[in-house]
């Protein structure tokens, strides 16, 4: 019986440490995922057109019906590295004979003041296409999870388990995962949660966090 209590106490202490250092651990997790070029892209679908070769798939399988991602957004972002006007230029003539504003077409990564407000594209600018894609996918999922966990802590008066459940339900909702890479849906949920949290922090509250 004492051994069981010790295990429970050890687990509780472990979870408390994770909670205490959640931001540091999340950042380290992001670094690891980006280092190994991990993403949820369905770029493996290009194998259907390019023939046999290493697909790079380690878990799951590419989803053909997510063509807005692997057939449009991701190739456009990759194209930016090879922009004939300079890597990640705001304008491009790579396709077509006239200048195209890359910030207006799917909001592609560009060396432009507007990209300061699009941190999930910074990976492309600093790490290149492969790790930029990983940064785009992993940073959005991690920040989405954290922001909704913090919002859950406010909504539930500091109940960690309920907050984790809320964060999981939002982050892995089928509708959200279907449109995860495009349409700015993830960013909308992140900024919405952060906006509420900022407003909460600006106003004194008597709520106390608890287990």
Which ranges hold each PLM region?
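Hydrophobic membrane-targeting alpha-helices
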Residues: 37, 147-155, 196, 200
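Extended hydrophobic/Leu-rich segments
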Residues: 11-18, 158, 199-202
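Short secondary-structure junctions and interdomain/linker hinges
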Residues: 38-41, 126, 130, 204
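Start-transfer (signal-anchor) and selected internal transmembrane alpha helices
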Residues: 1-43
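Membrane-interface transmembrane helices that cradle and orient dolichyl/undecaprenyl
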Residues: 193-209
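Alpha-helical multipass membrane-protein architecture
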Residues: 181-183, 207-211
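Catalytic-core regions of glycoside hydrolase
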Residues: 187-191, 211
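Active-site lumenal/periplasmic loops and adjacent helix-entry segments of GT-C-fold
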Residues: 46-188
